[in-house]
Amino acid sequence: MKILRITAQGLPLFKKDLDICFYTQQRVCEEDKDSLYRLTDNYYLHSACAFIGINASGKTSVLKVISLALNIVKNEPINHVEAKSILGGAKNVTIRTYFYDKRSYVCCLETVIAAKKSKTGEYVYSILSESLWEKPIATVKSKKYLTDFTGMKPVEQRNSDEAYLSDDVSFVIAHNKKANDTVEIFSLLSYTNVNVLPFTEDIPLEVIAFLDPTIEKLCFEQTDGKTFIHLKFKDEEEIILNNPADLEQYLSSGTINGIITFSMVKEVLHSGGYLLVDEIENHFNKEIVTTLIRFFMDSRLNKNGGTLIFTTHYPELLDEYDRNDGICIVRNRNGITAENLSYILKRNDIKKSDAYQSGFLEGTTPAYEAYMRLKKSLAASIN
């Protein structure tokens, strides 16, 4: 299963409807094909999707919407999904997830969700209604109509027959079983501010050597229900730990984060799934971040169409992109918006980091007035 587009209406934090495309918006030249994933003849998907914006612009919120939509089509109960918090107390949120399945059909799943406060004061979410549309991709005349279902009747609608289904699980579960299809999701949303390595039986030595060449051995062992961590640095005695949190005393947060990330990258490239990373530059140096992006953009390595979806503050990372349509600019001006860069910047030959930092794109640089107020405040506190 490949996600083509996600739209969301009625979200409390957003200024207008959210609309994110994962397929190319601009014309695809021969030289572009090396960094894209070919879905079918004339349709290509982005392998690395960037969401950039200043602090508090809403980048994490956009990532949460994507995570929620992916988990809905994966049949996860909404109330078990961490990203459900983006729904807030909304009474009517409509999420449409457009995807391409194993039968070579383009599908649109529309899920309407409502929040209700429980006795404990927490919000509990349920699906009010659901519809599924589908069409063979062979019937699509051009990219313009790829996700257009205007005038078409749904092939399925949620009804009382779904009584056996929990009211927070999508009825797309039946479609997925019939098509023998699913979507693999790996998320680093919860690891943005946590540096604890989860138990893993296999940490590739190549990953460890790339992140920290001084490490000779790092592996987990489980004996009698207890976990032991074996850590050895070159020319040093082996250290044995029994708590993953203790690794922080020996390894940098960048190395721990890197091991978590690159272990997931291996899985995503193998399965053709999705890796969501919030603040990709957090704890990483720029070289490691660009390496990660290049792995996904290498169509020879990324044969199965694994997709990296990330947020960043780093404008320099935009220069890794030859195209504009794999980048979204996130702003928060009385509500969050996410706009595809190809709609704002028509030419690919303008250096993207310069356009971003110069303020040419509007709302991408901290306001000068706020900067001056901060400077005056600091000056007053020093005097």
State what each model feature region is.
Residues K2-S67:
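Pre-Walker A-like glycine/lysine-rich segment at the N-terminus of P-loop NTPase domains
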Residues V112-D224:
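Electropositive, glycine-dotted interaction segments
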Residues F14, H283-N285, L317-L318:
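Catalytic P-loop NTPase motifs of RecA-like helicase/translocase cores
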Residues A48-N55, F228-K266, Y274-E287:
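Conserved ABC ATPase signature
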Residues M1-K2, T291-N383:
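C-terminal lobe/lid and adjacent interdomain/linker elements of RecA-like ASCE P-loop ATPase modules
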Residues Y44-A50, I54, K64-K116:
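Conserved P-loop NTP-binding catalytic core
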Residues Q9, E184-Y250, E369-N383:
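Extended helical coiled-coil dimerization/tether regions that scaffold
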Residues A8, T97-R103, S131-E134, F233-E238, ...:
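Short acidic, glycine-rich loop/turn motifs
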